[in-house]
């Protein structure tokens, strides 16, 4: 993978094929000359995590008229992870250089990434050994995705020029401000968010009860350092609040090294 040729890019998301974020990302990259294939869920799939469709068929169809004319686009009835799996096995004739996800309408920070369909789409690429990047605009209200797309174009070029020794997932969050107001880019560690959540009981028009999960962030916690990074490395949550673009390298290996060492030292089962 080198920066002097067009890159083969696979893009997915969790907001659906018609979302403005994925259109802005795909069109920006295609306009720059990259070979872009988009395979997204056919509708909203936010917070579906890494779920897969196993108990009913997946339906998919090619989509025209939404993207740049050079973009090949498909919609899929499954989840974001389904979409990437389907693309890699049934749509693409060649392995992509990168798997991209987003641009998500809303942040994916801290422990929120464990629920994120956007991050899971990128993670599916990583599981297949493909470098991947998840992009999110850190606001549910802001609708200007172009600064994030412009940064995506820059970052894709940098990753092509300086490939990682092993495939890595970069989780990128962009503050919802103009390009001139972005203070810079920070390499961050994953933070921790705590929510106050309730299941609100409601009644449907027929008088039957149902429940709606509602919640809001009540605390952004400075997570204990389990990663052995220097203490001055900021969390993604803190840096995005200071209007920095955040880049957090992620992996799918969830082994707790300290927990492993504790079990080993105490010889629980020897």
From Swiss-Prot:
Enzyme class, spelled out: hydrolase
Give the matching Pfam families.
SurE
Tell me what reaction this enzyme catalyses.
Answer: a ribonucleoside 5'-phosphate + H2O = a ribonucleoside + phosphate
Output this protein's name: 5'-nucleotidase SurE
Write out the function statement from the record: Nucleotidase that shows phosphatase activity on nucleoside 5'-monophosphates.
Task: Give the E.C. number(s).
Answer: 3.1.3.5
Family per similarity comment: Belongs to the SurE nucleotidase family.
- Record flagged with keyword Ribonucleoprotein: no
Which sites bind a divalent metal cation? Answer: 14-15, 46, 104
Q: What is its main location?
A: cytoplasm
